[in-house]
Amino acid sequence: MLEDNRDLLQHPRRNLGARYRSQARKFVKLATHDETRFHDNIGWAEQSARQAILYDFTDEDNWRCLADIKIILSDYDGLVAVLEDLFSILGRDPEQIAQLKEVNFQQFGLELLEAALARDPLNPDTWWKQVNSAGDSIESLEGFVERCQRLDFSDPRANIVFGRRIERIRDSGHTKLFIELAQNLLAHRPQNHELWLELGRLYERMNKSDEAWLCYDHVQSLRPNTNVRDDFLARLTGKMDGLASEPWSRPTVAKRQEFLDQMVSLARRVSTVEDVEISKQSVESESESRSIRLEKLLEQGDFLSLIHI
């Protein structure tokens, strides 16, 4: 039950997110018009904005709402925390924020937020249109695939965001690429029942009954109240009725073990981190190089490049 409640919060619920964001903005207006109750109202505004993100982290306006409140409160450490959280969902290294510690977040914090969302939209349809029209400053499909192979998707929110992105890749006809990327995401977070379900449906359309059954079986083990495995078996049995061929039987224990071994092997591969020894001199040189580049980008106002330093 606890796991079910946690998953409910991790899956976007747009209506609740929009409701809390609207409530947060109302409290912000009250705070700006009544100085005597400013702290009370702005406190409620911040709490509501946090709830908006909690219920729907895929709505960019929810992030903007909380960031605006952090600016009003002059809570720049809090703004950094918001950006770190967003970067985690976008599959980017939160330590990139630490590399920007010299940035004046009072002046450039909101611009950095917009730059991150402009380059990596949370809406999967917007992201897919952007990939298809990729220019020099926008990530291509090849770049996205390369990035997926080296990022950590253990954050369930990142797993959901990227899972919906690769669904757009599947819908465009790249089925083999979808399977590869889906297995990578599931290796990071096997509890993503939505992605298991989509993978099972794809295998079913490809007439790969064993693989489809294994995926549906995993979904039903994660969500016992669903009947996707049983429904699939009923559909499969219905197709077999009246045919001379031998009826389909469930995958053998060996087949199931092979499937699980593949996922374990992939999980080990994606979680392996190479230990690289870096000399003190090279660290200082890299830090100095970043500082020089940071100053140039700030002078040019190039915020899109800032998030990739």
Please name every model-derived segment:
Residues M1-T32, T36-R37, A81-L177, D217-S305:
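Intrinsically disordered, low-complexity, charge-biased linker/tail regions
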